[in-house]
Amino acid sequence: SVAYKGFDATADSLLSRTRKHRLLRSGEAFSTSALVAEQTRIEALMRNNGYYYFSPTYTTFFADTVAHPGYVQLQVRPAAQRPAVAQRPWYIGHVYVTIRDENESNITGRLDRPGYTYFFPGTQIPLQPGVWRRSIQHMEGERFAAWAQKATVEHLYGLGIFSAMDVNYAPRDSSFNCDTLDVHVSATLAKPYDASLEMSGTYKSNEQIGPGLSYELSKHNAFRGAETVAWKLFGSYEWQLGASSSALNSYELGSQLSFKFPRLIMPWFNPTAMGRRYRRRIAIALTRAKLLGQPLPLQLYDYTPVNGTTTLALSGNWRNRSGFFTFVTVGGNLNYKWYTNPRKRHELNLFNLEYNSVIRTTAAFDSITRANPALYISMRDQLVPSISYIFTSTSPATDRHPYWVQFLLKEAGNVTSGLYAMTGRSFSETGKHLLRSPFSQFVKATAEGHYTRVFSPRLSLAMRAFAGVVYAYGNSTQAPYGEQFFVGGANSVRGFAVRTIGPGGYHTQRTKYSYIDQTGDVKLEANAELRTCLFGQLNGALFLDAGNVWLIRPDANRPESGLTLRNLKRIAVGTGVGLRYDLSLLVIRVDLGVGLHAPYDTGRQGFYNINRFKESLVLHFAIGYPF
């Protein structure tokens, strides 16, 4: 049997109301690990309900093994010698915030606000009081809660503007009956500007090689509200090995300007108001607790403050593909990210507008698009007004076998088409324009999951599954090129070069100078990789990949490409081995992929249908793990 005895009325009530969470139960095997786990659980429960000085050692156990041989009669009791400060709940008092700049200037300024006092260098507070109120999850008069302490530290560090930060709690005075903790926050601002320069190299299966360069400049706390303004400039240049003509050279240039705010700026959502409503519930419960000696409702301590960001970005991209086309993309995006708990992230792109335009084509490219209308539609000049939502869930950091799951839902053009419908135009009518350009209309959904089975510190099996579909309708018959799916490459089916598989059983004899990629509306893919440590920081891998893409609408120019039961059996399969050099912050990866089964007709029967073994080899250089 298990009995909880000797606790005061408040603690006893808390333990009784959390009976279903107890880790010690009658009939289970007796173990010291279970006792330690229960001590930790009780500590968390008490510290979330005001007992700031409570520690695991203040819970003791008395075991009687004589009364019933083979069984243990267990009593859980508070330690008799625990200090007086650990025997009562503590309440939050005043919050003192000391802000230092990166130069450690003298503190000369002071600002008093209800519940808060700020000390800072100069005459103007470097970080507005509203940011501190949203980040510090304590309120004067409420009971101390460990979750609020943890959330405060996470919020402040999450702002990304401090080089050092500390949160401490101290009794207001030294009297015996003191039950008030003042909060002392000390923070040092980091340097306001950050700059980064990244260099990369590319070698593609079509023998294109070249360097890439990216430069980003960021200003933190730009408007004294922990905002970040960032400007990024990037470019790359590629040339064809063995070719002497400059017409075979390609390049890409792009730039992005973004404004990031450390809160959710939504007209219909006010996290501050939510916090006020929550605080009012706390205040009412506090009054009852003090007058009637009742504990606070436990659900109040399940509250998770909304921690989110708002980002507004403007971008432009210029792509020149030698001998084929020049493609320009400009756009803007309003993005929200927030966490409902540390393992669940939500991302909402409430407004995303892209304009795609092919400003130059060659006769060779025009002849290809005339023979392939679907390619022409996917790359024509068009506006893409879209809304998307992404949900990501991860396993706890303590899980032995970690997992990662992500779902995406995206739609484009439906709001615009709905406005047209209000003027009498059919929702499914084609030929509608926005800003004198046709707009794309589609819906897209994807699901992806990763799971790693850890056998030992040196051996694990990583697995990945992906499924996606994009369907164009209404004003479009083909989804934009950038929204379609592809298979092959360093992070896909590694036995085949990037974008060379599918759709379905279709296969084109493209040359090494071709930029016509194989894409589809539906994608299924699965990967498995056995990872082992060879020696030092060098790891090895043995992998198996499978997948393909298909078209929803039949395309006469690409036979065997449609989504049918027969074509679903057309799956590309590849295997191979790889090396990974782990530099902690950077993983350099080399994979040698071997194609086992091509989904198209190669003229050879059987599962292994690659004509020549040399043709099945693909070498990939990459940064980071494939999944």
Spans of model-derived segments:
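Membrane-embedded beta-strand positions of outer-membrane beta-barrel proteins
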Residues: 197-199, 229-233, 312-314, 405-409, ...
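Gram-negative/organellar outer-membrane beta-barrel architecture
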Residues: 11-14, 25-28, 125-126, 145-404, ...
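C-terminal outer-membrane beta-barrel translocator/porin domains of Gram-negative envelope proteins
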Residues: 114, 118, 202-206, 347-533, ...
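Strand-connecting loop/turn motifs
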Residues: 51, 192, 224-226, 309, ...
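Interaction-mediating elements
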Residues: 1-158, 167, 180
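C-terminal beta-signal and terminal closure region of outer-membrane beta-barrel proteins
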Residues: 487-495, 556-627
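Solvent-exposed coil/turn segments that connect beta secondary-structure elements
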Residues: 3-9, 59, 77-83, 95, ...
